[in-house]
């Protein structure tokens, strides 16, 4: 079903490698994203998007402000419908799943940590079990074990009885990641999870997400403006610019000039050998 008549001009200038037909991981299949403005018409943010994110890898989505990163992640997470094409997770199209089924396929972490007064970290993490607990929300022994293991994996088990407003920003963000882990989904999507953290906390959270992807063989996809950290920690990059999406490893995208075109300015350049961003003319 294609409810919108989307023109083909302005599609991505350089298709990303891969055919978007993964049976494991996240696949974008000729995806168009945007918003319905009235019946039968839409505001198109980007279209013709083909990309893949693999289990056991940290995939980072980077791009300038306003290019549509959040819109893309919302579409991947099935928080809004695609205008055309589809998103698949482990071979299942997300747009044909029920809300309950989607909640068992993908967990979502947003940049703003939840504002939940009088809520403990343990209670927040337990919310990740909601897709499995039924109408009354009662936790079984298995649910409690899943929550404990999720908190252990991110290093906050000792904080389970602390209130959210009693811990640091980094600890709160780790709690939201633990909630996503407790949800037991094959994919986790995070929209700028380090946006409000100091630099050491940003690095710690990014390194944690990389480890969780590798050890749990999860597909972890996140957006970030911290390109320096993404270059050092991501296995795979999605670079979004001008309505197009290009994918590859940091090394590949540095070698073919994609990252230089994205980064290069009067002040900045990319050192492809070290995958570090350099300031020009600074002594």
Regions found by a protein language model. Give the residues of each.
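ABC ATPase nucleotide-binding domains
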Residues: 263-283
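Catalytic Walker B motif of ABC-type/P-loop ATPase nucleotide-binding domains
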Residues: 188-191
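Helix-to-loop junction immediately C-terminal to a conserved catalytic motif
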Residues: 77
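Conserved ABC transporter NBD signature motif
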Residues: 85-93, 102
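Conserved ABC ATPase signature
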Residues: 163-167
């Amino acid at each position: 079903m294609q409810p919108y008549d989307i023109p083909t001009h302005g599609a991505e200038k350089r298709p990303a490698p891969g055919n978007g037909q993964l049976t494991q991981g996240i696949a974008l299949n000729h995806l168009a994203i945007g918003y319905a403005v009235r019946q039968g018409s839409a505001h198109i943010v980007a279209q013709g998007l083909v990309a893949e994110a693999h289990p056991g890898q940290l995939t980072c989505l980077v791009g300038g402000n306003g290019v549509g990163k959040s819109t893309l992640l919302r579409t991947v997470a099935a928080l809004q419908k695609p205008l055309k094409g589809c998103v698949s997770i482990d071979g299942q199209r997300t747009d044909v799943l029920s809300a309950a089924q989607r909640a068992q396929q993908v967990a979502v972490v947003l940049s703003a940590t939840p504002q939940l007064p009088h809520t403990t970290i343990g209670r927040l993490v337990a919310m990740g079990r909601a897709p499995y607990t039924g109408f009354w929300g009662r936790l079984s022994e298995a649910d409690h074990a899943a929550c404990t293991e999720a908190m252990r994996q991110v290093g906050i088990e000792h904080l389970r009885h602390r209130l959210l407003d009693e811990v640091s920003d980094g600890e709160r963000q780790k709690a939201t990641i633990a909630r996503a882990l407790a949800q037991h989904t094959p994919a986790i999507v995070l929209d700028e999870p380090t946006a409000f953290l100091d630099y050491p906390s940003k690095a710690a959270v990014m390194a944690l997400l990389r480890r969780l992807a590798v050890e749990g063989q999860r597909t972890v996809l996140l957006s970030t403006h911290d390109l320096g950290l993404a270059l050092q920690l991501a296995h795979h990059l999605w670079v979004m610019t001008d309505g197009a999406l290009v994918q590859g490893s940091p090394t590949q995208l540095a070698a073919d000039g994609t990252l230089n075109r994205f980064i290069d300015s009067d002040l900045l350049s990319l050192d492809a050998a070290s995958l570090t961003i350099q300031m020009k003319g600074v002594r």
